[in-house]
Amino acid sequence: MVAFATEKKQDLNLLSKIASGDGHGENSSYFDGWKAYEENPFHPIDRPDGVIQMGLAENQLCGDLMRKWVLKHPEASICTSEGVNQFSDIAIFQDYHGLPEFRQAVAKFMEKTRNNKVKFDPDRIVMSGGATGAHETVAFCLANPGDGFLVPTPYYPGFDRDLRWRTGVNLVPVTCHSSNGFKITVEALEAAYENARKSNIPVKGLLVTNPSNPLGTTLDRECLKSLVNFTNDKGIHLIADEIYAATTFGQSEFISVAEVIEEIEDCNRDLIHIVYSLSKDMGLPGLRVGIVYSYNDRVVQIARKMSSFGLVSSQTQHLIAKMLSDEEFVDEFIRESKLRLAARHAEITTGLDGLGIGWLKAKAGLFLWMDLRNLLKTATFDSETELWRVIVHQVKLNVSPGGSFHCHEPGWFRVCFANMDHKTMETALERIRVFTSQLEEETKPMAATTMMAKKKKKCWQSNLRLSFSDTRRFDDGFFSPHSPVPPSPLVRAQT
């Protein structure tokens, strides 16, 4: 055993600190949930007791529209008889700037997803291998190792990888609270900025996600103006991640930072940068189309040089240029995507409402922010992790705990709803129903004891076993005799 440990240490010494370190961030419950799914993925026929993937923020609701367009336009691919005549032109080495028709089509699409209220210059578009590569490129352009970016919480766990791992940049959390719907306030920004200063971390920028992942909320005009003014006053950069721009639905409105800076007099646009991609709005994460759009000429020049490490293939550029130039298709796709997202959101929220499960009111994104604080043994992240393990390994739903999103309050979970078909969603809701109904059955006999004890303590037992057979029961001792007994053990969030 000692020899093995020594050998392993020697192997690590052969590698760089970046390669052998844990900066990737994969040692978190966010990625552990993915591992549980990969080991036992749900399939309605082959693996009906498998884990349902609700931890993947992917838009699969309009795949039929995408397939229909591809079949109708074989000339968009250089690997078909209709498009092969362009093979030689596309397959040869291309400029790092990207195909002109690709940049023009992307700029037009970005305008359309922002209700044509702003214009984007194709010459300011820098391509990258997905939003992951785009974020890292921005970090390399704006910050040195040891510098920091302010990031409002909760935020996407992948930022720890995208912005920190290879750049050496620090992420400084801006603490937001459920009491005001996790809104970003100037007071919270000032507090985080001061904390960074006390920790000797030079703050180089503020990164915000709009619409928010994981909240599904959008930033209103006044909030965006306050963010622009804050960063301008501090002389730091504002990076707006807008990759969910076209996922709003219902009465929700997306306002881009590009629109707001037009309304602010004397705004220093050199400090404004946008990260975008086609992964969420078009449901094309596998094509790895990421975009850096900067109003800073120098950043555009530097980012273009850095893009050589993560270019979008010319074949993909060619396909995307053809697709996004079809305005009739794009209009139909965006319209239908919003309708289907609204319908799926209504389906899952109606189901949760019927079970008394709370969620943060929001109308954007491919997920919702579920409130299970009332089920925690104690208001700690250890209790949150304990509950999460039950949900993943017993209920067999891979939802992501708030702690992995750096949420300040334990008990929140992100639940993705657009990456599955209708029947799988029904199965997921049924599992939640079974879960909650059995909790009620377990707590009812304990009501008298609970009233006499007059205690409000909850207790998760590690020996919980769920069954989705007709018997459907829990092991004895799931709740302690001191558990409170509301009409449902889950309560709606007051947000």
Curated annotation (Swiss-Prot):
PTM info: Phosphorylated on serine residue by MAP kinase (MPK6). May be processed at its C-terminus.
In-chain residues carrying the UniProt-annotated modification Phosphoserine: 480, 483, 488
Activity's dependence on pH: Optimum pH is 7.3.
BP GO terms, sorted: cell division; defense response; ethylene biosynthetic process; fruit ripening; phloem or xylem histogenesis; response to auxin; response to jasmonic acid; response to mechanical stimulus
Entry EC no(s): 4.4.1.14
Sites of N6-(pyridoxal phosphate)lysine modification: 280
Cofactor(s) of this protein: pyridoxal 5'-phosphate
Outcome (variant: residue 483 to D): 40-fold increase in ethylene production
Catalytic activity: S-adenosyl-L-methionine = 1-aminocyclopropane-1-carboxylate + S-methyl-5'-thioadenosine + H(+)
Binding site for substrate: 58, 96
Organs and tissues of expression: Expressed in roots and flowers.
This protein's pathway: Alkene biosynthesis; ethylene biosynthesis via S-adenosyl-L-methionine; ethylene from S-adenosyl-L-methionine: step 1/2
InterPro entries: Aminotransferase_I/II_large, Ethylene_sulfur-biosynth, NHTrfase_class1_PyrdxlP-BS, PyrdxlP-dep_Trfase, PyrdxlP-dep_Trfase_major, PyrdxlP-dep_Trfase_small
Quaternary state and interactors: Homodimer and heterodimer. In vivo, the relevance of heterodimerization with other ACS enzymes is however unsure. Interacts with GRF3.
PANTHER family, sorted: 1-AMINOCYCLOPROPANE-1-CARBOXYLATE SYNTHASE 6, BIFUNCTIONAL ASPARTATE AMINOTRANSFERASE AND GLUTAMATE/ASPARTATE-PREPHENATE AMINOTRANSFERASE-RELATED
Function: 1-aminocyclopropane-1-carboxylate synthase (ACS) enzymes catalyze the conversion of S-adenosyl-L-methionine (SAM) into 1-aminocyclopropane-1-carboxylate (ACC), a direct precursor of ethylene. Involved in bacterial flagellin-induced ethylene production.
Designated name of the protein: 1-aminocyclopropane-1-carboxylate synthase 6
Organism of provenance: Arabidopsis thaliana (Mouse-ear cress)
